């Protein structure tokens, strides 16, 4: 098949993308087409003033071949449009930055170690300029064009149409639209089939934006480029919606929204337009908020709802500024120009006065917690973070309870009360714990600041000689709930032991003999119904629970994680944690401090409304489903995402449908607000359009949530089987409906879904789901929590980690880009050991853990520059860090590691600071094996390799 005219991942011609003049989102620069601009020859040179690389003559080698060939393609020829996976001409090639190689800058390695061409590695293309020492592959690799030697033919869907006579696909024979559907004025994304076996997935494709949302001209009432929702807030699995349930069912694709209402931990890092005049116009029938896709009627006095078509009156104050006492231009209002907007809510949106921010800390003071340093580290971190806890309205309250086999309440007086001292009250009755002096147990941070500081300083000393091994955490939770339920707030549990007395008592049920067997599934279930029923009661009283778990032994994460799951909280797990290791102490202190500083929404509810004919059918994430379509969050976190499945109940007669997410919440500063996020999508009657506009990362996120649900209800084997069955079903459907049923020796799938098999394999091999007799159930349960809460960019990385080659990274990697000042990352590599050179230095990063892999033949100069040692045997392996040394290469390696942890630039909030493990290829076997489990495309631990996986899929598809 010859090159198609229009490549996937490229925006359509001017006037066709999103709405009228919409520009690509700021975080997607480098992927938009630039019509009319002739391609530049080659790539831009390195900026002047770049730090010069040191010369390692003995270790220099040529990296333009073998496994080190870059995963991108060169710029298109003049007159061509960039194809899927290829940046436009003159645009940066990798991570936003292309560069000419420096022939005078050698790299670490051994010139004799040239590798043959490997499976999945792009082939070098003669005559193309190299990028940072890497050569570009042939254009067919990334464009959906046939492999060399394939017969030429028309491209895109036109090629399918001409080759597969009789099929009503593509422009040759358009499918008949139903009578009520208006003729589509704008073509949608074209479908580019690709052969998964001959044109394999490349990890760099995961950084591409989703297929563009192409709306008809004049879909929105203003020409604002922000009229449709950016993907960092809401991504749909389908960016072209089938008009009927039968077409959706025929496609076998899921229709769901991946929703992340907040893109940062703090408001100032993610500015969303704020409507402060309290003029909120909503539809009288469906209660949707006015948005850029309504229609104004009757000289602008009325507006027609784009969800249910009801005509509503425009509020009189809509065109009037009450503060300035003057008329305003309606077309400048935020809610008509921005798909994401926040309203300050008037009195009628409040059931009671806005609640203050309340944190109740439950400290485990058992022997395990004290001896590991947990009590001292957590108390010190809270003390150091008091200034970071949101308290702008000076209403924030704190409370403290210590827990062993008894409950220890602490009554903290106000700073002005000179005669009172902080007192500890011990309660041993665990069945009905009473509250000794409730008014002194939750104290205002502002009024009691000095006393709180004194208490936190002395707390570790109070229990430093304890020998108590008991933990009545269940009873402590009940007492804490009783204490803060009149106000609502957060209970923060810091525990290093299994609750073994009182309410919610748990038994040691870990049994290594059942790991990897069907009986393992019971270990992932809740052992005590208390944890689910208590969580539901807490949610009703606006109490959210976060768990920080640190046990070096079995702690039953499966049971304890129910508390955050139903209350909008999160479970953080630190296996084998000990403050005696600086890396452990620093990681927890950093994460816990960021957690305390994060702004959260209180008393929140989330609801998704949609165009008539669409219905929200299922909800996934950490919250309590209060009714069929209302999700309740006692506290709304900034670092989680949610998945909502959409059903098509009626035939959709419109060319555009809308889905609107609304989050009603109280800010940390006591202000009631509504965040409204509106997504508009085109509809289609054509199956090819549906597949061409499917978003592989959103689809993976949906199935990650489904797999966790399946694992908890039916077991791990059922979850893995369902993932394989679903992928097989999609491949079979595409083959039957869109590839004419004949694939020869290949495996056809759309270019925009080429990463799906690798992502599903990564999900099946993830520590939460993979078949293994070596994974403790606590580790599994913690991984399942991540698989069902991580924001989409972090989830995709957790499923398919990042691999960077550091010893031969391009000259511009590890230093700031001259234009953006952002550190440039090296191009990512596919997760296969075939990509490794024995003299190399590699970073493997799944977002939770990082491995710095040192090859067995690493040259001495590399070791000296990065680690300050001359011999590999002197290298300290395990948890560690890269020392700060006075040389350019060390600085660049540290910059890459630091940049890989920069979540803000990726449009997500996260407190996670990954551990860094130094791994020697010829070092500790267990550490090496652990790092290798992240190489998804290798065979490991009862899991098949990528080649075997593709072979298995092909066999099942052609059966």
Curated annotation (Swiss-Prot):
Region feature Zinc finger-like, mapped onto this chain: 283-308
Gene Ontology cellular component terms for the protein in this record: cis-Golgi network; COPII vesicle coat; endoplasmic reticulum exit site; endoplasmic reticulum membrane; equatorial cell cortex; Golgi membrane
GO molecular function: SNARE binding; zinc ion binding
Gene3D superfamilies in the record: beta-sandwich domain of Sec23/24, Sec23/Sec24 helical domain, Severin, von Willebrand factor, type A domain, Zn-finger domain of Sec23/24
Record localization: Cytoplasm; Cytoplasmic vesicle, COPII-coated vesicle membrane; Endoplasmic reticulum membrane; Golgi apparatus membrane
Keywords: Cytoplasm, Cytoplasmic vesicle, Endoplasmic reticulum, ER-Golgi transport, Golgi apparatus, Membrane, Metal-binding, Protein transport, Transport, Zinc
Entry binding sites for Zn(2+): 283, 286, 305, 308
Entries under Pfam families matching the protein: Gelsolin, Sec23_BS, Sec23_helical, Sec23_trunk, zf-Sec23_Sec24
Domain of life: Eukaryota
One GO biological process term: COPII-coated vesicle cargo loading
SUPFAM superfamilies given in the database record: beta-sandwich domain of Sec23/24, C-terminal, gelsolin-like domain of Sec23/24, Helical domain of Sec23/24, vWA-like, Zn-finger domain of Sec23/24
Coiled coil regions, renumbered to chain: none
Membrane topology of this protein: Peripheral membrane protein
InterPro entries found in the cross-reference section: ADF-H/Gelsolin-like_dom_sf, Gelsolin-like_dom, Gelsolin-like_dom_sf, Sec23/24_helical_dom, Sec23/24_helical_dom_sf, Sec23/24_trunk_dom, Sec23_24_beta_S, SEC23_SEC24_subfamily
Feature: compositional bias, Low complexity: 1-35, 165-183
Residue ranges, annotated region (Disordered): 1-135, 163-184
Similarity remark: Belongs to the SEC23/SEC24 family. SEC24 subfamily.
Description of how the protein assembles with itself and partners: The COPII coat is composed of at least 5 proteins: the SEC23/24 complex, the SEC13/31 complex, and the protein SAR1. Golgi apparatus membrane; Peripheral membrane protein; Cytoplasmic side.
Function: Component of the coat protein complex II (COPII) which promotes the formation of transport vesicles from the endoplasmic reticulum (ER). The coat has two main functions, the physical deformation of the endoplasmic reticulum membrane into vesicles and the selection of cargo molecules.
The protein, known as: Protein transport protein SEC24
Organism: Pyricularia oryzae (strain 70-15 / ATCC MYA-4617 / FGSC 8958)
Upper taxonomic lineage: Eukaryota, Fungi, Dikarya, Ascomycota, Pezizomycotina
Gene encoding the protein: SEC24
